[in-house]
From Swiss-Prot:
One of its GO terms (molecular function) is nucleotide binding. Disulfide bonds: none annotated. Pfam families: DUF520. Nucleotide-binding protein. Gene3D superfamilies: 3.30.70.860, YajQ-like, domain 2. It comes from Bacillus mycoides (strain KBAB4) (Bacillus weihenstephanensis). The lineage of its organism: Bacteria, Bacillati, Bacillota, Bacilli, Bacillales. Belongs to the YajQ family. Keywords: Nucleotide-binding. GO terms for cellular component: cytosol. This is Nucleotide-binding protein BcerKBAB4_1061.
Length: 163
């Protein structure tokens, strides 16, 4: 009997990379001329980014700097869920961005439906915040990976534990 192969579909954000990107972005903000004397800041509180600045325009600039640094460090920006801009103390504005870790039930169902529509001999299991795909043929697994990558999901997915 042939051994089954499998892999896991996950959605993870590496927090050390996020911290590094924040530090680089803060360094750039401190050195930029248009931010001289401004109260712009980026903080990471557990899995929530807090962006603070003087006004909405500068907040957008801070967000642009942060996104560029996150992209350079290969952090998926699809997994950032921005809240609304709110006023903070001292005539500043603040925006929270939640880092989405793991695949929620709705996205797991979407991935499951994508795989089932292919009509290959593969089995899928939703395990907490990941989806495991098993099959006897590694070619089928490769086809599943290609299909899931080709679909535009609201979160960024990675494929791990390919055995």
């Amino acid at each position: 009997m042939a051994k089954e192969s499998s892999f896991d579909i996950v959605s993870k954000v590496e927090l050390p990379e996020v911290t590094n990107a924040i530090n680089i972005a803060l360094k750039e903000i401190q050195n930029r001329y248009d931010f001289k004397g401004s109260k712009s800041d980026i903080k990471l509180e557990k899995e929530v980014l807090v962006l603070t600045s003087d006004d909405a325009f500068k907040l957008d600039q801070v967000k642009d700097v942060l996104i560029s640094k996150l992209v350079k460090r290969n952090v998926p920006i699809k997994n950032l869920d921005y809240g609304k801009v709110e006023t903070a103390s001292g005539n500043t504005v603040r925006q929270r961005a939640t880092l989405q870790q793991g695949i929620d039930k709705d996205n797991a169902k979407k991935i499951n439906n994508i795989i089932k529509e292919m009509k290959l001999k593969v089995k899928t299991q939703v395990q907490d915040d990941q989806v495991r795909v098993t099959a006897k043929s590694r070619d089928d697994l490769q086809a599943v990976i290609a299909a899931v990558r080709s679909v535009d999901l609201p979160i960024d997915v990675q494929f791990i534990n390919y055995r």
